[in-house]
Every structure is written in C-alpha cells, then in structure tokens.
Amino acid sequence: LAKLKAVKALSPLPCLDKKIRELAEFASRYYIYGLGETLLPAIPKWWKSPANWEKGLGVARIDKLSAIKNTPSHDKVIDPEQLNQPQADALRHLSNADHKKFQTLFLNGVTGSGKTAVYLNYLQQVISNHRDAQVLILLPEINLTPHLERRIASHMPNQEMAVLHSGLSDKQRARAWYAATTGKAKVILGTRLSILTPIPNLATIVVDEEHDSSFKQQEGLGYSARDLAIWRAKNESIPILLCSATPSLETWHAIERGRYQEIKLSERIHQAQMPIVELIQTQQADRGTVISGILKRTLQNNFQEGRQALIFVNRRGFAPALSCGSCDWLSECPDCSGFMVMHKQLGSRRSPVLCCHHCGLTKSVPRSCPKCGDSDLLPLGRGTQKIEEQIREIIPQAKVLRVDADTARTGKLSEELFTKIHQGEADIIVGTQMLSKGHDYQNIGLVCVLDADARLYSNDYRAPETLFAQLVQVAGRAGRSGGEQAKMLIETRYPSDPVYQYLRNYDLAGFMKHLLKERQDSRLPPYVSQALVHAQSTHMADSLSFLAGAKVHIEKNSPNQGRLVCFDPVPKALAKVAGKERAQLLIEAESRTQLQTQLNALDEFLRKQSTGRITKQGKVRWSIERDPLLI
C-alpha cells in the first residue's frame, strides 16, 4: 500500500451517464450510423482536446460563463395571475402531469395565443417543485434563441441557463455543455444537437415549433431531434411537451389515435384576430411588374396608417436566374443541375454576382452572353433584393428592411435586424421564411405573400403541408396587438387550391383531414415507413448501378415481399451537386420493424463491399436515411 500512488483525474468531465448512452445507442441503431459517429459530434470540440482538460475546471466556472445567460429582458413578465383563462386552463392541465411518468403532450395554440408564456410558467413550476430538476427546450433555428433567452431570464432570473447551438465559439459551447452536464444549469435552451447533451436531472422536455423541418438533420446522422426527444422522454420516464400552431401531420395523426394528449389554445391574447386572407389571382395582376397594382395600393395605405408591413418571398438574391434575350442561355451552375442566382451584392462583394445556392460557387455577372455575345442579359423572376429595390422606388419615404440569409449571416446581425423590427425602425420588412418563425411583432398590419405557388406544385409530396404551415405562421406575425384587424394578401394562379381555401378560414382540422385522406390513398407517411438509400459518384451510371445491386439484395432477402416495396433507383430531383451525380433508392413498408430489419441487413451487405461508406473501388459514396422528409 505504501507504494500506491494517488490517482489524478485527467478530465474534469463526468462519465457519460447510462441514459445518454442508451439514447446514443438507439439513435445509432435506428438511423443506421456508427455509435462513435453518433455521439462524438454532440461533445464540444474544446473538450476533446486533452490539452484543455487541466484548465477545464477553471474554464467551466459558472460565474464566468458568457454562454450562461441571466440578463433580464425588457419584455413584460407574464405571471400565472396575468394569464388569460385559456392560458390558465392549459397551465393547469400541464401542472397535473405526472413528472415521473412518460407522456406526450401537445400544446395546440393559434399563433399569438401565448404558448410560450404557458410553457415558461410550466417549466418554472417543474424547477420549483422538484429539487435539482433540469429542463430542456428545443428550438428549430439559432435566430429564435436570443429572444427566448431574454424571456427566460426575465421569467426565471435566479435560474442558471445554458444555451447550446452551432453559432457559439468552441469555448462558449464547451462551457454551456459543462454546465448542463454537471447539473448546474437548470434551463438548457438549444437547437437540434442539444438533444444528445447529457442532462443528469432532466425532468421534462419542450419542443417548440415541433412541425419545423429544421429539426431533421439532412447530412451525416439523419436524425429528427423531435423524434429523439420523444424517445428520450420515454426512456427517462418524463413528460414531453410539443408546441405548434401548425402541427406536423405525424403529430396530428398521433393525436387522433390517442397517443398524444392535446391541450388547446384557440384564442389570441389581447383579443386579437387573425388577419383576413385575400387571394389575388395573378392573371388579374399587372403583367411584367415586380409588384402588382393591388399590392402597391395596399402597401401605400398601410404605410400611411402608420403600421408595419411584411413582404414574404422565399427566394433570397435579386433574381433566381439570369438569361440572354437573344439565345437560350441561362445562368446554369457548371457543377450542379440548378441555376446560379443573381445577387446585386453578396457579403463583402458590392458588385453583382452569380451564386449557386447548392454548392456555393460564385462568379461575377458576365458583361455579355457567354454563348452568343449579346449584351442583352435579363434577370428572371424575383428575389428579396429585387423586391426591396422595387419597394424603395414605390414608397421612397418608407424605411425598408431586408431579412434573409444574406443580411442575417450571423446571430449578432440577425438579432440586430429583429430588434429594429420590434423597435419600429422599419416600415416595410422584406424577407424569407426567417421572418415567419416564432417572432412576436406587435405592429404588423399587412402581410403580402409573393410566389407562394412555387411550393404548391413541386415534386415534394409534403409541399402542401409545408406551404399551409408556412402561410399560417407568416399570417400569425400580423395583428398581434389587437385593434384593427390585419390583412394578408397572397398572389396565386390557383386560388381554388385546397391549401388556400382551408387557409382562408384557418381550418387546420379540415386541412389535416384532407391531407390524411390523400396520404392514405397514396400509401404515404404516416401510413407507411420509408427509407432512402443515397448514392453519389462522378458518373450517374455508377450511382444507379450501385443502387440496382442494393435493390436486388433486398428483393432476394425480404420475406413477405408484399408488405415491403422497393422502388427502382432514380436520379435525385437535384441530380448533380458540386460535380457529384446523385441517385436514390426508396424503400417503404407498413411495418417499421420489418423495414428496420431489412435496412440492417442491407447496411451489413453494403459495408462488406465498402471502406466506411465508400465502395472499395472508390467510385460511389452511399448512406441510408430513415424517415426522409424529401423523396
């Protein structure tokens, strides 16, 4: 014993607990991804370096954490006594939940009904009533976190909060992760990767805007943070609360089947009404103009009344493509099967450029047509920059603000833009879907939606569901303060389409019933489970040949073939990206278990002929995706 030496712990981090290991193991199995590849990305890069371990404890001190927020907000704190009756009823329902039992609750509230106030009061009760309790709030996007951070800090000023998302520096994320992992942070607020954070005293989970497609990761581990959150809650025997004004069809289906408990908030606060929806048939609109006469007049009237207007067009840039007026040349990307978008300015470049939004290739706008030499080059279509330019000409005295991925490149820039809107420093806001999510604007009197039809008739079977949700969400930004009812104008060539007809009455239940019937008739989710096998290579023939071999293997080894369908390999809708030709193989089954069994066997078969996920010949890179959003 005299020769024994004291053991020195090299890392200040606690071991990963059993529950988080079980979550990672489930994700690895279900999404058919390596366990290390699943778990390691969730651990901050800073903690992976042994050089940082010695100074780790000092770095992780809570009182020095810039990623731990407790700065009070200027927003009004809503105490339980200040909730309206529907909010108080919803809070009472949540308060009665058994916090040692798994259950999935769904807070179904119209936009502006005060869902956030309800769940903040609920979380405050959980933390107050359960010693050492921690709570996790998941948001779909980084730009939604600053406003909610401030609200939480005002609502629970004495509780430590850790914020986790990819916009933080390595050290900031390491500090916040440490605070969550050691139980020091009571409120953990983050985007999708936060679901894999060890939280030793997790008491409940909230998934806000649960319908949002951003919860599904598209590259690498193709997981759904919402679905993993539900599994985690079940495994840890705690309740989970999903929130949305526009639930996903899968969630709605689960409510109908009695798997989720629904709590309704059917009234907006301040006795506000949802905007009146007016459909403008584009055949009647001014031809050859960027903004129709009807929109011009309505925007001018709204400006004169001193109310803000929001113009929603889900295309950033000046124009989706550049064309030649003399020949058939279009600004196609040489490395992708898409067009290079024209930007009047992009980042630090103040002169016009062409940029591919798929691979990032950027070029100067040519002075003349590369094909025929003619100088008559014309922008096709309209993006946010073009709309902004036109609005400045129509109403020169108005303060116009553009909000898209170009102007809100960082979290700081994004927060500055939204602060200007909240403080009334913008009269007309032009932007993309960034504007439609979770922001509480108080003076929007008019919403204009341009090019909504672009999503309506696409090859994406989820497009009607996505468009309806997007339009309801963007409508919900208007008329929140009460007073005169706001308006929503939508330009469309197809005003009789069910999406627009159900939207006019905000008939969510009717639209969901309509969609479920369509999906059931077409044998689509949620009535079947799907998976995609992706393949990419330099030549499309190699990608298709690889997938054809995968299909042969599945058909040879699948019992009860009638219950499992394997479609022929096809090129992807966007077949070429960054010089790689991409194809896919769709597999679907009524039984999720049967599909999982076949995918596991297929993964084993493909790995035998591959190094990692690249074939041994080096020609094809492949992956398997569960529950794809796009097929």
Give the positions of each predicted feature.
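Conserved nucleotide-binding/hydrolysis modules and their immediate coupling elements
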Residues: 1-15, 353-357, 370-376, 380-405, ...
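Accessory, non-ATPase domains that flank or precede helicase/AAA+ motor cores in DNA-metabolism machines
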Residues: 1-244, 251, 256-272, 303-304, ...
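Amphipathic alpha-helical transducer elements in NTP-driven molecular machines
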Residues: 13, 17-21, 32, 36, ...
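Cys/His-rich Zn2+-binding cysteine-cluster or related metal-binding knuckle/ribbon modules and their
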Residues: 33, 41, 170, 182-185, ...
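Accessory helical-bundle/CTD segments and flexible terminal tails appended to RecA-like ATPase motors
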Residues: 50-53, 278, 283, 331-332, ...
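Conserved strand-helix element at the start of the C-terminal RecA-like helicase core
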Residues: 116, 133-149, 299-325, 377-388, ...
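Conserved helicase motor
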Residues: 139-151, 155, 161-175, 190-197, ...
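Flexible beta-alpha connector loops of hexameric P-loop NTPases
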Residues: 162-170, 212-223, 283-289, 376-380, ...
